[in-house]
Each structure stands twice: as C-alpha cells, then as structure tokens.
Curated annotation (Swiss-Prot):
HAMAP family tied to this protein: Ala_tRNA_synth_B
GO biological process: alanyl-tRNA aminoacylation; negative regulation of DNA-templated transcription
GO cellular component terms given for this protein: cytosol
Name of the protein described by the UniProt record: Alanine--tRNA ligase
Lineage: Bacteria, Pseudomonadati, Pseudomonadota, Betaproteobacteria, Neisseriales
Domain notes: Consists of three domains; the N-terminal catalytic domain, the editing domain and the C-terminal C-Ala domain. The editing domain removes incorrectly charged amino acids, while the C-Ala domain, along with tRNA(Ala), serves as a bridge to cooperatively bring together the editing and aminoacylation centers thus stimulating deacylation of misacylated tRNAs.
C-alpha cells in the first residue's frame, strides 16, 4: 500500500465514523507563542480542548504536517542516523471534543488496523499499553477487543513523579491531562528489542504506531485531578511509521515516498544509491521540512523560525558536500517532492518556484563560505585531540555561517567532543560587545528633566547650540573627556532622531577646543533628542556653546531613500492592490527596507512595474512639500496613514505632486528628481503574509547596475559564449558533460570494487562447510555492500566479512550465501564483529552492516572470525 493510499484510507475510515475531515494547519502556529512549529495533530485544536473555541463539529480527523527541529522538540541531530527520526512528518489523527471517549477510540483504532476492509494487520503482531491505574482502558482491551493479558502492558509513573509517565499525557503543569493507551507493532524477532517497559524497550523490534490520549482530568495548581465534565480524545498515528508496517519494511526511509526522494538525492549529488548512506537520508528528510516551511511563509534568517530553517538547509548542503556535490543541488529536489506530495498538499505545487528560489539563494550564500569553513575545521581536527576548541566552533559560526549543530554533526562523525563551554564564552563575549555598541541608545532611559530640544533639521544642517546635558555610562555627568563614549543634549539640533523607520542622523558637535563625533541620534523623551557618540578630542562641558553639524552625504542618502520609500509604497498599492499595508521599514543611507502585507511572492513582472512607476515619478521631478495640519484636515487630503499608529492632534503631511500623500515626520528631498535611479534588489517573505522588499537609489543603484553588467561580461568570457543569449546554453552543456563524467567515474569505481572482490573470493579460507573471507580493504560503506552482495551471489557457501576505515571510523559489512543462512546469519556475524571495534550492528540473515570507533582492534577482530564461524558450523 502506497503512503498516499494509506493517508486517504485513514481519512476515509474516520469520515465513515462521522468525523469531519479538517485540512492540515500551517506549520507556523497562529496565536500560540509557546510553539516554534506545529508538532502534533492536536495543535490546531488546542483552544477547542481548553474550551476557548467552538467548532461546528464534535468529531474531526486530520493529516497534519509537523516539524520537530529546534526548541523543546528537536530531532535534528538524529535524522539520517536512525530508522524513524525526521524533521518533517505527517501525523494522522482523530479527535473527539466531548463526544466519544475510551471505548470508541480504542474500537476505532482496532477496527482500522485489523479489519480486512481496512489495513488487515495480523492481530498477533500488535500489543497495547495502558496507564497502570487506567483499569477502564485495560478492561476494554482485555474483554471487548479480546487481546490476551500478556499483550497488554501497564506502564506506571516511570518518570520520577506521580502522573509523570510515558502513558500519562499533560498539556502543561496545570490544565487538561489524562492517561493514554499506545499500540505497538512487532517488526519481528530478527530485530533487537523488547516490549514496552522492559530493559530492551529502546530497541527497534516493538514500534509505537498509535497513541490514544484520553483527556479525562483538569489538574489544578495544587495538583488535584478534577474530572472534566466533557472528556475528550486526541489520537495520533505516524503516517511514515505505519507506511513502513504496510510495506513490510523496517525503516521509514524504505517506504515508497522516501525511496523516490532518496533516488532523486543520489541523482542530484552524483552519489551511489545506498540505504546505508546517512547523508542521502538526511537530504531526503530535509527537503521535506524546508519546502513545507517555506510554503508556509518561513524564510531563512538569523532569528526564530527562519534560523531553524537556515540550520536545516545548511545541514543538507553540508551532507551534499560530503557526498561530493559542491554545486547548488538542494533546490532541484523540490520538483521530486511536489511529484510525491503535491497532490495531498497543493501549496507545494502553488509555491514551487518560490521554494526553489529561496533554497537556491540560501545554498549559494552558504556555498561562498562552506569550503573555506570546512578547510578550517579539517585543519583543526587534523591536529588530533578528542575535543574541538570553542574558539574554532565560534569562528565557524560567526565567520563562516556554520550553525553550532552543523559543526556538532561533523564532529560526531569523527567521535570528537565539542568545547561547548568555550563556545558559550565566545558567544557571551560577542553579546557583551553588542551591548557595549548599543549602550548609548535611547532605550537606556537616560534621566532628564530639563528643557525640550528644538529640532531645526528640516531646514538647517548646522546650528549654533548650547549643551544642556551630558551622559556617560548611563549617568548624567558635567563633562566628557577625550575618548569617552556618551550622549549630548543640546537646545537646538539639526540632527534627526530615529523615528518612523528612518535611522538617526550622524555628524559632529564641536567648538574650537573640542570635537564630539555623533554616531546616532535617538529620542530620550518625546521632545528631547540625544546625540550619542564619542568625544574624539578636547573636553566638552555642560553649558558650552557649540556648533552642531549633520553629515551631509549620509543625510542626503537617507532623504533619497526615505522619499523613494513613499513612492514605492504608493506604487505597491497601485500594482498589488489596496490590501497592501506597511508592516515595518528601515531607511538608512545604504538602502530602504520595506515590509508589506501581501499573501504571496511579488512576481518579477510586478516588481518591474513598481520600479517603472517610481522612476517615472523621479523623472517628473515634482516638488516635495510638507505641511503641519490638524488630523481632520489631513484626512481630507486623502493622506495615507499607518494602521494602528498613534497620531497627535496635529500631523505632518508630505505630498509629492500627485504621486504620493502620506503622514510622515522624516526628512525628505526637495524634488523627486533628487532621488536618482531607483532599483529593487530583493523581495522575500519574512512571516506568513508579510513580504520584505529592499531597494536602493542614486549612485548606489548605479554601482549595483554596473556590478551586474561586469558579472554578465565575466560569465560571457568564462563560458566563451559569443553573446549574452548563448551563456545559458553553454552552462547547461557544461553541466551535462560534468554529470556524465561523474556517472562514468561512479561506474568505474563500482567495476574496480567488483574486480577487487573477485580476488578476495579466490583467496577465501576453505572450512569445509563454508568459504570464509575476513579482510580489511579500501572502500566506502556503499562499495563494501556492493562487493559483499556480489561475492555471496557467486558462491553457495560463502561467509564474508569486509571492513574499511574512513575518516577514523570503522565500516563493516557481512554477507552469507542464502543456502547457509540456516546455520550462519550475517546479522549475528556483524554484531559479533562490531562489538569488538566499539560499535553495534545487526541486519538481515544474508546481509548486514555496522560501524565502529576503534580501528586499532580491527586485525584482532578479523582473526577471531574464523573460530566464531567454526563454532556456528559445528
């Protein structure tokens, strides 16, 4: 049964039981600040369970997309190395909001799992757990379902406190809670592991496939369990786990959905396809979480959800690099994912281009530092030692963009510990530097009770002023000496204080005897401006007469960008629609950054039209006029106002001919022609329904255009293209040739491995009942598997154990010719071998792989195999 069929079957079953099929909620939880990402089916119903929300249905069923990466629920480091850890997964669920309870929940689960009409899983492959005190659930399983008592396991308070158990669920320290009953599937005795509650429960034999949570109580602040008037049910079935059961495979990565993605990863990286290669699994998993997160409005950034996404992308790119792919490849997998899951989740198809673009941009950005960062890391690791220094970890993070867990991932592969304390010291030092740099911002709430500042900056760039107050280290002082950082308050100021998205002015406050460099201007109070900076010469005292002068070049650049922002705002509303609202802005001398409400990516055509309209207004060179008027009069002009902004009784209205009318207190050009060339250089989403646009003006825009022109010419020269139009064809032809060469190289390596294996079989030790090959060779894990498979296929009585050492780690592969597997099992052999070299392993009777950490024990281990085999054969 395909994964897509299983998903539909589940929803259909519960629909026949009176459940409303509710579509998956976004991965970005709305109105729940406690969650980084949606990580369970019940998240979208949390307020229903708490009684804050009512739905027109009392039974629901969902296929919920979930992400567990970052925050409390973080599976990132295990992904690729286990059979069932994922950053993205689908949770199938059925829910009762005060409708049915334990009896129906258990009966529904059992019917769906075991009925011939639905999944038809053999009943003797299933086991149930219940909370130790939940006699009601126990009796339903025993007397109504008919499950033998030895297959019903009571789980008590196994987490160190009352009602703290694997089988007792709670939303928080207080609130809804209750026992749960889990259903486990037996993957077979050839897999190591024991039943829940046993010492071997962490093994992979018994796997949880279903969890019924019975919200039965409300825990108060005293810890009392008060029965809920309307008990509810929340159940979950992991789609990938159940697909593995239905497809008779052990690992989630062996199901149809992942097999197709793994093949796509191998295709795009040029790597040999192997189920024993963790990097293939990492990338196949990560393309799912990254694509779905971007589809739901998350974009790579340095904070919050965006940073988690960035970490996942960079981990995938690093694993591609590990497989030998140094070119951007990750974004090319989106099309394969859309083919697999676009039917169930149409947002993937709708936003495919946006997802590909976001991934490609992040790949390209990281590619610039990945190789250099890896070289730094390799040099550090080559020096030996069991721990990577915290300074190196920080440098990788700060300079080369390596998230901490990416470095940890690499070190884990080499059995190297991380100096976490040293890294934290470096991080704290960086935070301290940042605090020092920001220590003179207005948010320091400097004490001041003197006269207000009179702002002259609309019409004057220089004023003759008097020093009213001085500050150092957040305290009021009488003087500032050379080298002191501090703040200055003067009676008349030409410096604009940061407000409305425009940064504060910079410049100088000086006299014949001293000079204070103004690096920022902030409001200390509503009408009191503080000039923050450094006393570069002399001594400045309260009461001094000084000259205050704004840096003209930076002020002019700020004005150009601020005026351009107004024109862009109007053009965006005209092109995209009246729903566009300003959500934030940052106007600096370098650029203008403008955030707007818009549900989707702004297309290239729309951006071009916005640019055309703004530049048209610039060429018109109309006057820019500002007037102070009452709010009532301002409204009559049709001036644009920001939703939620608080305005006074009098406001400043800025008009740019017939192009734009808006309330604004910032500084602006005299005529629109002063803006110069206007160019949008980036557009992207920063939150669900919010887009960020960055634009540049004047000489900055000209410089950008010239750089683009130089880049195109360099590409033409590098590709030896005749014209710009020929470049793409040249690049595509080169890429196709390189890909063909990579495939040819992979085939050649495989052939060499097979030839090397044939020599091993010729030299095998004949033990009568079996021919033994136990040897160390030079090969990677994939090649080991291929050689062993080839050798056991050429003989009726071969027992093969091959070992290799790569990057300090031991790889083992065991194989047994099928006629011999009744006496000798490859899984037993590889387990015996792995234990001697510091590892673990297991697998099928005919083929099994494992790893180890102690390469020094290899010779001794290989010698011991003969006596082990003789014992098995006797």
């Amino acid at each position: 049964m395909k994964t897509s069929e299983l998903r539909q079957k589940f929803l259909k079953f519960f629909e026949t039981k009176g459940h409303t099929v509710v579509r998956s909620s976004s991965l970005v939880p709305h109105d729940d600040p406690t969650l980084l990402f949606t990580n369970a089916g019940m998240n979208q119903f949390k307020d229903v369970f708490l009684g804050f929300d009512k739905r027109p249905y009392s039974r629901a069923t969902t296929a919920q997309k979930c992400v567990r990466a970052g925050g409390k629920h973080n599976d990132l480091e295990n992904v690729g190395y286990t059979a069932r850890h994922h950053t993205f997964f689908e949770m199938m669920g059925n829910f009762s909001f005060g409708d049915y309870f334990k009896r129906d929940a258990i009966h529904f689960a059992w019917e769906f799992l075991t009925s011939p009409e639905w999944l038809n899983i053999p009943k003797d492959k299933l086991l149930a757990t219940v909370y130790a005190e939940d006699d009601e659930a126990y009796n339903i399983w025993l007397n109504e379902i008919g499950m033998p008592s030895e297959r019903i396991v009571r789980i008590g308070d196994n987490k160190g406190a009352k009602y703290v158990s694997d089988n007792f669920w709670q939303m928080g320290d207080t609130g809804p809670c209750g026992p749960c009953s889990e259903i486990f599937y037996d993957h077979g005795e050839e897999i190591w592991g024991g039943i829940p509650g046993s010492p071997e429960e962490d093994g992979d034999r018994w796997i949880e496939i279903w969890n019924c949570v019975f919200m039965q109580f409300n825990r108060d602040e005293q810890g009392n369990m008060n029965p809920l008037p309307k008990p509810s049910v929340d159940t979950g079935m992991g789609l990938e786990r159940m697909a593995a059961v239905m497809q008779h495979v052990h690992s989630n990565y062996e199901i149809d959905l992942f097999q197709d993605l793994l093949k796509a990863v191998a295709r795009e990286t040029g790597a040999a396809f192997s189920m024993d290669e963790p990097s293939l699994k990492v990338i196949a998993d990560h393309i799912r979480s990254c694509s779905f997160l971007i589809a739901d409005g998350v974009l790579p950034s340095n904070e919050g959800r965006g940073y988690v996404l960035r970490r996942i992308i960079r981990r995938a790119v690093r694993h591609g690099y590990k497989l030998g792919q140094s070119k951007p490849f990750f974004h090319k997998l989106v099309a394969d994912l859309v083919k697999e899951m676009g039917g169930a989740y149409p947002e993937l198809k709708e936003k495919q281009a946006q997802i590909e673009e976001a991934l490609k941009n992040e790949e390209s950005r990281f590619a610039q530092t990945l190789e250099t960062g890896m070289a730094l890391l390799e040099n550090a690791l080559a020096k030996g030692g069991k721990t990577l220094d915290g300074e190196i970890i920080f440098k990788l993070y700060d300079t080369y963009g390596f998230p901490y867990d990416l470095t940890a991932d690499i070190c884990r592969e080499r059995n190297i510990e991380l100096d976490e304390a040293g890294f934290e010291r470096e991080m704290e030092a960086q935070r301290a530097r940042a605090r020092a740099a920001q220590s003179f911002k207005a948010n320091a709430q400097l004490p001041y009770d003197g006269q207000d500042t009179e702002f002259k900056g609309y019409s004057e760039r220089q004023t003759e002023s008097k020093v009213l107050a001085l500050y150092k280290d957040g305290e009021q002082v009488n003087e500032l000496n050379e080298g002191d950082s501090g703040a200055v308050v003067i009676d008349f100021t030409p410096f604009y204080a940061e407000s409305g998205g425009q940064v504060g002015d910079v410049g100088y406050i000086f006299s014949s005897e001293n000079r204070f460099e103004v690096r920022d201007t902030q409001k200390i109070k509503a009408a009191v401006f503080g000039q923050f900076g450094v006393q570069t010469s002399g001594r400045l005292k309260v009461g001094d007469s000084v000259t205050a002068k704004v840096d003209d070049e930076i002020r002019n650049a700020n004005m150009r960008n601020h005026s351009a922002t107004h024109l862009m705002h109007k053009a965006l509303r005209d092109v995209l629609g009246g729903h566009v609202e300003q959500k934030g802005s940052l106007v600096t001398a370098e650029s203008t950054r403008f955030d707007i409400s818009h549900p989707q990516a702004v297309t290239a055509e729309e951006i071009a039209e916005v640019e055309r309209r703004v530049n048209e207004a610039v060429l018109a060179n109309v006057a820019v006029n500002a007037a102070i008027m009452s709010m009532e009069d301002a409204q009559k002009t049709g001036a644009m106002m920001l939703f939620g902004e608080k305005y006074g009784e009098e406001v400043r209205v800025l008009q740019m001919g017939g192009f734009s009318t808006e309330l604004c207190g910032g500084t602006h050009v005299s005529r629109t022609g002063d803006i110069g060339l206007f160019k949008i250089i980036s557009e992207g989403g920063i939150a669900a329904g919010v887009r960020r646009i960055e634009a540049i003006t004047g000489l900055n825009a000209l410089k950008w255009a010239q750089e683009q022109e130089r880049l195109v010419k360099d590409i033409i020269a590098e590709t030896k293209a005749q014209t710009e139009k020929d470049v793409l064809a040249k690049i595509q032809a080169g890429a196709a040739h390189a890909k063909a060469l990579e495939k040819e190289l992979a085939r050649a390596k495989a052939e060499l491995a097979v030839h090397a294996g044939a020599k091993l079989l010729d030299d095998a030790k004949d033990l009568g009942a079996a021919k033994l090959v136990a040897a160390q060779i030079e090969a990677d894990a994939a090649a080991l598997r291929e050689i062993v498979t080839d050798l056991t296929g050429k003989s009726d009585n071969a027992v093969i154990l091959l070992a290799a050492v790569n990057d300090g780690k031991v790889s083992l592969c065991a194989g047994v010719s099928k006629p011999l597997t009744g006496k000798v099992k490859a899984g037993d052999l590889v387990k015996f071998a792995a234990e001697q070299v510091g590892g673990k392993g297991g697998g099928r009777p005919d083929l099994a792989q494992a790893g180890g950490t102690d390469a020094g024990k290899l010779p001794e281990m290989l010698v011991s195999v003969e006596s082990w085999l003789c014992q098995k054969l006797s």
